[in-house]
């Protein structure tokens, strides 16, 4: 068995799918780096994310399944369900084999059923987050801490950017250790150095304003490229496929 280990990004996963077809792998499984355990048996291969290869896979999916199909794949991926990468690979293999077939409608197939169930769950979680997330206003800053069941933070950010376009805000997921900052100009992903960030609400507005000035406003270009939070950042070009964003 060959194990394709990727960087946990959606583009990394699509690159791994590309590799499966490029090298005609049969006995293969795709696994995120943070979930991969050293093997006694089997062959490990690191997949290096390639945006061009990822786009080719995405284009093929859209050609066969349309934007709705891409949305289903995206949502299922963000579910973080165990073995979801392999379910998606299985579905894509069926798509290539039966390009005119309604593969995603075959709910009797275990992989398809798992994908559709996960995608639906993620979609519901996105709507739930939009409805129930509440920002706390501290000084000039709005702050919200959320722990969604699925990794939906990138999918709800556009909603809050539109809703609070005239306010500075922070949306943070302490369970996954990353968040997004809106500074009135752009939305930026961030990963705090302190693993306990957001665990306690500062007692005063002044304390939080100090945090804003000393931490958030000094994020530089190098930090924006930090691989840890890029793992969680859904590129904006994928938002077009998701009605909820």
Which functions belong to the PLM regions below?
Residues 27, 67-70, 124, 128, ...:
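Intrinsically disordered or highly flexible coil/loop and linker segments, enriched in small
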Residues 12-23, 89-94, 155-162, 209-217:
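Short, hydrophobic/amphipathic alpha-helical patches that form generic packing surfaces
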Residues 1-3, 142, 194-197:
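Glycine- and acidic
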Residues 31-127:
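Charged, alpha-helical interface segments at or near domain boundaries
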Residues 1-51:
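N-terminal ordered "arm"
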Residues 165-237:
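A recognition module on extended beta-rich or small alphabeta surfaces enriched in W/G with H and D/E
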Residues 101-192:
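Internal, well-folded beta-alpha domain core
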């Amino acid at each position: 068995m060959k194990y394709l280990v990727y960087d946990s990004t959606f583009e990394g996963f699509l690159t791994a799918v590309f590799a499966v077809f490029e090298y005609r792998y049969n006995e293969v499984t795709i696994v995120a780096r943070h979930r991969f355990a050293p093997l006694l048996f089997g062959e490990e291969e690191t997949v290096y994310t390639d945006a061009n290869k990822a786009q080719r896979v995405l284009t093929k999916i859209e050609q066969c399944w349309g934007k709705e199909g891409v949305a289903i794949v995206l949502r299922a991926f963000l579910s973080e369900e165990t073995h979801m990468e392999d379910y998606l690979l299985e579905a894509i293999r069926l798509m290539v084999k039966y390009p005119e077939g309604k593969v995603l409608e075959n709910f009797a197939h275990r992989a398809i059923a798992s994908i559709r169930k996960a995608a639906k769950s993620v979609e519901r979680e996105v709507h739930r987050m939009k409805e129930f997330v509440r920002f706390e206003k501290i000084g000039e800053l709005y702050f919200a801490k959320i722990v969604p069941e699925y990794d939906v933070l990138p999918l709800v950010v556009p909603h809050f950017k539109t809703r609070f376009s005239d306010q500075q805000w922070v949306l943070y997921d302490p369970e996954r250790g990353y968040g997004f900052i809106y500074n009135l100009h752009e939305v930026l992903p961030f990963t705090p150095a302190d693993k306990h960030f957001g665990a306690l609400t500062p007692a005063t507005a002044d304390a939080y304003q100090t945090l804003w000035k000393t931490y958030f406003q000094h994020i530089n270009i190098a930090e924006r490229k930090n691989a840890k939070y890029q793992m969680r950042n859904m590129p904006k070009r994928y938002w077009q496929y998701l009605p909820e964003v």
